[in-house]
């Protein structure tokens, strides 16, 4: 029974980590589009998020060869 609870606890922690990363990736894409095209997704190519402690680096790339980085800061509660 203790092994089951331990495995379940680990699974929940991993699920939380994945959901935080997905949210940050969405934030990354939204920030890229908002800063360069003011919400227009026409020239958007990709956004890659690299998590760090209390924030991360967001790489933005557009089809018109525009590339830049954004530093996202996420407050930890």
UniProtKB/Swiss-Prot annotation:
GO molecular function, one term: toxin activity
The UniProt record lists the keyword Secreted: yes
Organ and tissue specificity: Expressed by the venom gland.
Domain of life (superkingdom): Eukaryota
Compartmental location: Secreted
Family label: Belongs to the scolopendra neurotoxin 3 family.
Protein name: Putative neurotoxin 1
Organism: Scolopendra mutilans (Chinese red-headed centipede)
Taxonomic lineage: Eukaryota, Metazoa, Ecdysozoa, Arthropoda, Myriapoda
């Amino acid at each position: 029974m203790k092994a089951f609870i331990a495995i379940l606890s680990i699974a929940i922690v991993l699920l939380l980590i994945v959901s935080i990363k997905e949210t940050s990736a969405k934030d990354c894409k939204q920030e890229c589009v908002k800063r360069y095209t003011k919400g227009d997704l026409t020239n958007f190519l990709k956004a890659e998020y690299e998590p760090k402690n209390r924030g991360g680096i967001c790489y933005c790339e557009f089809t018109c060869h525009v590339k830049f980085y954004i530093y996202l800061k996420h407050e930890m509660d």
